[in-house]
Amino acid sequence: MKKIILVAGGTGGHFFPAVALGEELIKRGYEVHFITDLRCKQYIKQDMKVIFHILDLKRSGNIFLFLPRLSIAVLKAIKLLYNMKSAVTVGFGGYPVIAPMFAAIFLRVPIIIHEQNSYLGKVNKFFASFAKKIAISYEKIKNLPEFAKSKIVVTGGVVRENIRELKVIEMSSRGLTTGSKKSLIKALDSVVKPRNDKLFTIFIFGGSQGAKLFSELISASIQIVMQKQPSLELNIIQQAALDDQVKIKDIYSKLNITYEFAEFFDNMALQYKEADLVISRAGASTIEELTYIGLPAIFIPLPSAADNHQYYNAKLLEDKNAGWCLEQNNISAEKLADKILDLISNPKILEAASQNLLKRRKEGHKLLSNLIEEVI
């Protein structure tokens, strides 16, 4: 049985797509090993079928501290990869992949890199010259060196299986009208619970890097929404830290809004199933999941994201009328409230965005697996 090594870490946005790819490769008969870091250890579940290895590399702004750490990590990675004797190593970008990728190059193991964002990250750009192939999620990608263009294969992003199992209801059957709607999506193998068709559900989450701003900004926006349209029947599903939940619950209760809170949603499919609109960051895995099921979103890109890649992700969708990009530095509760009200009042705009999302949907788990098999 041939072995394949996947390398991803740092955030859930890198981790979960790599796990989804691993599950597809296991179905094809490969033994899949996954090298990740301590930050992603929290996401590892017993039912995941890939074999995990923790190899941590702590970042430091001091080059004299970082280089010794990197050297030690590379030596550990060389030992690990040598014992595995893998056929290929696939890196998903970010600093946690640096040591294993250097080890693969040293051992002459073929490497493939996958860029999930619309902007080629620094680590992936560095390893582009060593890669056999460069898989990308977007048809157009910024920061790509000229020499690397011949290595490009558009595979799309890799979406988790439980998200792929969500079924998109045909546009003609959605029945979305102002004040009356149906669920946009439903689980293939589950019974959809009865619900109030007049209820408009917004799913709010800030990604694996936290949602402090969302707790403050969005609760203020919802207050404005309800002040402007008191008859609106609103349901909020929101990621929020425990210390923020008490305050937000008090606000929503006074507004007679139904709500559900969690610090972290383990099964996003359940929340996607209920939502009519999403408000979120613009990480690559979030965008790919929403694209796959055609669920429209207002994106508030994380301004501190490396190379501002979240802004480029969201702007690309906005330019294709497949979403809305509101920059954190320019946003206000009033602006966000106006956008929410505009979309609730104009369901055809939501339908059009959903259709445009579905136009760029790809079976990334299959296409990337096919590419790996070509390299092997």
UniProtKB/Swiss-Prot annotation:
CDD domains: GT28_MurG. Disulfide bonds: none annotated. It is an enzyme of class 2 (transferase). Its EC number is 2.4.1.227. Gene3D superfamilies: Glycogen Phosphorylase B (3.40.50.2000). It is found in: Cell inner membrane. InterPro entries: GlcNAc_MurG, Glyco_trans_28_C, GlycoTrans_28_N, RPE4. Pathway: Cell wall biogenesis; peptidoglycan biosynthesis. Belongs to the glycosyltransferase 28 family. MurG subfamily. Cell wall formation. Catalyzes the transfer of a GlcNAc subunit on undecaprenyl-pyrophosphoryl-MurNAc-pentapeptide (lipid intermediate I) to form undecaprenyl-pyrophosphoryl-MurNAc-(pentapeptide)GlcNAc (lipid intermediate II). This is UDP-N-acetylglucosamine--N-acetylmuramyl-(pentapeptide) pyrophosphoryl-undecaprenol N-acetylglucosamine transferase. It comes from Rickettsia massiliae (strain Mtu5).
